[in-house]
Amino acid sequence: MPEAKPAAKKAPKGKDAPKGAPKEAPPKEAPAEAPKEAPPEDQSPTAEEPTGVFLKKPDSVSVETGKDAVVVAKVNGKELPDKPTIKWFKGKWLELGSKSGARFSFKESHNSASNVYTVELHIGKVVLGDRGYYRLEVKAKDTCDSCGFNIDVEAPRQDASGQSLESFKRTSEKKSDTAGELDFSGLLKKREVVEEEKKKKKKDDDDLGIPPEIWELLKGAKKSEYEKIAFQYGITDLRGMLKRLKKAKVEVKKSAAFTKKLDPAYQVDRGNKIKLMVEISDPDLTLKWFKNGQEIKPSSKYVFENVGKKRILTINKCTLADDAAYEVAVKDEKCFTELFVKEPPVLIVTPLEDQQVFVGDRVEMAVEVSEEGAQVMWMKDGVELTREDSFKARYRFKKDGKRHILIFSDVVQEDRGRYQVITNGGQCEAELIVEEKQLEVLQDIADLTVKASEQAVFKCEVSDEKVTGKWYKNGVEVRPSKRITISHVGRFHKLVIDDVRPEDEGDYTFVPDGYALSLSAKLNFLEIKVEYVPKQEPPKIHLDCSGKTSENAIVVVAGNKLRLDVSITGEPPPVATWLKGDEVFTTTEGRTRIEKRVDCSSFVIESAQREDEGRYTIKVTNPVGEDVASIFLQVVDVPDPPEAVRITSVGEDWAILVWEPPMYDGGKPVTGYLVERKKKGSQRWMKLNFEVFTETTYESTKMIEGILYEMRVFAVNAIGVSQPSMNTKPFMPIAPTSEPLHLIVEDVTDTTTTLKWRPPNRIGAGGIDGYLVEYCLEGSEEWVPANTEPVERCGFTVKNLPTGARILFRVVGVNIAGRSEPATLAQPVTIREIAEPPKIRLPRHLRQTYIRKVGEQLNLVVPFQGKPRPQVVWTKGGAPLDTSRVHVRTSDFDTVFFVRQAARSDSGEYELSVQIENMKDTATIRIRVVEKAGPPINVMVKEVWGTNALVEWQAPKDDGNSEIMGYFVQKADKKTMEWFNVYERNRHTSCTVSDLIVGNEYYFRVYTENICGLSDSPGVSKNTARILKTGITFKPFEYKEHDFRMAPKFLTPLIDRVVVAGYSAALNCAVRGHPKPKVVWMKNKMEIREDPKFLITNYQGVLTLNIRRPSPFDAGTYTCRAVNELGEALAECKLEVRVPQ
């Protein structure tokens, strides 16, 4: 049984330190530290290498009863692959948690800068039961480490008179040690009270701080259950507990009502059902069930069952409310138990999704878990989000059934990052990207052509109502005046010019504040003039597109409006005709139309398209002549989507995306690409780059291993962004495992080498399919695979190697992501058998004589060691074995000696020799095959005296090849010949049979007993033992006759009676006397003679007077008198007759 060790005692600071000086109590904030101790003997180091994850191990502490204890430890997060799981234990296996009580609290914090985890254990108001050995365990994936410490609980400090120092108080409420006056009222107690407290304290020390109900449970439990109960209730001082129980010497009372009680505790998962069963001694006893002292009534949740003497309570669909104490009551007896309802692990049903939002948007990050009302922890960039900080950070939590939502009402740039949700059964994470809000133009400004004194209205609409802006005319800001009005209503911005004048003509621009955006339109002033030109003038086209090129060219963006205003002159006014190639345009309405004015011809395209690109010709004619001009219209557009988008390689949290440039660049060279990513099944795309990426290969990072993703690409040119490409096939970031660990050589022969290793430290979501082993000759760089298919176990034997060569070996892990980094031996291995001297490992049961019965199998397995394979030889008495009876099979590690049916001839000494060249080892095995012995011989009755007989015999001729253990003697009467046992396992060849019956004649028989049992047949005595009768004188006893005479005596007197008139009545009494007395019945002192109303009977001294249908006249005093020669006796009673009303 393990024993908890107390904390080490502190050494005194100096030699002169007084022995009785009180120890200073450690402050609450900094518990006293004790020297570090070696771990207990039962905490032996494991075979694994130490991980060294503790920067500061918990120290053993010593604390006074009633004080608080604090234990602190620090864990190095750099040594851990993931966030660690922290567990505290008392003793070896008792885990401290929410069930441990409110006195135990746990705290955990993480410093992200240094990656150090600080964990604390707080125990409030410690009691004596808290002392003992504790253990801290840290686990993260495959990494596990633990360390132990002790908590020693001391009694409160006292002064020299035995008074507790806490009795001295100060009247002031200040925290200073010298403030106020000392108050000694706490010491004004009677001496008897102090003595009682000392006795109570001593009793508490004897009880080891264990509650009385636990002592009662231990007293009624079996010794084999002590350790189980101790671990269940956190008792670590097992030796003290056993001593206390031994002193108690309590006689366990057997329950009169229960034959089987409830177990001390039960555990069930929430939502499941559980059955509590007791067995009572009497099936007719009434039984009641109670929960926390309240009686349980039958319902659909609580079902009662009676099966024979068993009484079963079934609790259906257990909830946390069913976590309580239960008891069963039968009469005055009760038995108790406690039910613990265990919360199932909370799983992530719908994980978080990546989101990309703008500043000021409302954001809801939702996750759905498997249990309603479950506790989840939100974290941002590794830091926990709490409700206390929610007021400062502008976020709040919301629960909607199984959905947990983190809400940002007005998101800002500081809220971006990676958010994580952690439950006790899983976790998920997502990234929140916050961008500056982009302004969207909902309605652009249109060009205006107005006449004099008319009103011009420029109007635009943007996506943000709060955005303000300024108006400009030809680059000069427009100021409001009597004619000019500027308004801003919601998303609409207006510029109104009343009474338009020629100087109002120009380019008007609206520029929103804070955005690199401008909206422009042109105001054309239409002036009507009537002039008379008496002369004729040939037509002339006034066209100038660039002024610098010989060829007129115009560039328009697809989707935009194009308006070509061409001024023409001539008299009379010429007629303008527009052509595209040979096609003539004549329409004045529609998307493409012609507008005509006096001195201008306009060609309008409402929404330019790619097919509108080409050379346009305008021809003007009048009677005087004609003029022709051509314009090349180039329509530019956003490019087509990129092509052949695919994933070429993936890693643990990254993937390589490759694509081809678009077939059509939109008339402008492609300046770069934009990449987006999303989780499969999600609708939210997340931008990966905000600046255009010029290459066609992109590496995406910060991905979650084991999650399916999709990606797409946009092409960008000077015009804008293309449509998205086709989504890539779903892919999953998976990395190869890390290299295998601890590669060693286990065995080497002339042609083989056996390697062993341990699994990789990091396996990842892709798992591991197996391992590949490769070898390379020293001096060569070519690695030869030793196995084509991966092996699953962490060991492999490489065969067919050249003898004497020096070879280097390496092992790689393989999974769906590919090969891991290799684990290579530090030094080459020489392929040569390592000679090992032979050694026979004779089993313990073969080191002494091996005994078997005739007919049984002889199957001996003898292991040995030695390299190369030794030569094994079996002999018996120096001669070879008879192969017709004995079969021998030898392997590299053992030899088997087998006989199917053993015979006595197989007994003897066998020699086993194991030899390698000139080295040899031998062993001797002694085998004895036994059977039943023969019967004893010459069984004779040697002497008879009194009721005794002496029987002798000789040992059997065949002892069955085994030592005779004794003889079995029986006797039989010659008359009945029924055999009765006299002696069992009598070791001598003679015995004296006593207590034989006089006058009988006896036979005797004897069996021989050895290790196989009694002999099949007995040895029967040839003569008999006759027990003769001896002479006896009979003296009769003297007979004295007894005098049976006695005077009459009433054994049962008469009793007073009250009867109802008309119903027969009887008066009874009993009398004894010898000779038989004469009986006389009287009424009111008058003898009752032969009256038919009365019937007198006498049966064996029982006297009865029957009165037929009595009337009130029959009431009175009745007397019975009994008389014989020795005397008389009287008995009387009163009879009352009542008439019914």
Swiss-Prot record:
Gene3D superfamilies: Immunoglobulins. One of its GO terms (biological process) is cell adhesion. GO terms for molecular function: actin binding; structural constituent of muscle. Keywords: Actin-binding, Cell adhesion, Immunoglobulin domain, Muscle protein, Repeat, Thick filament. The keyword ATP-binding does not apply. It comes from the Eukaryota. SMART domains: FN3, IG, IGc2. PROSITE patterns: FN3, IG_LIKE. InterPro entries: FN3_dom, FN3_sf, Ig-like_dom, Ig-like_dom_sf, Ig-like_fold, Ig_I-set, Ig_sub, Ig_sub2. Residues 50-153, 255-344, 345-437, 438-538, 539-638, 838-932, 1048-1141 form the Ig-like C2-type domain. Residues 1-62 are annotated as: Disordered. Residues 641-737, 739-834, 935-1030 form the Fibronectin type-III domain. Thick filament-associated protein located in the crossbridge region of vertebrate striated muscle a bands. In vitro it binds MHC, F-actin and native thin filaments, and modifies the activity of actin-activated myosin ATPase. It may modulate muscle contraction or may play a more structural role. Belongs to the immunoglobulin superfamily. MyBP family. PANTHER family: MYOSIN-BINDING PROTEIN C, FAST-TYPE (PTHR13817:SF17), TITIN (PTHR13817). This is Myosin-binding protein C, fast-type. The gene is MYBPC2.
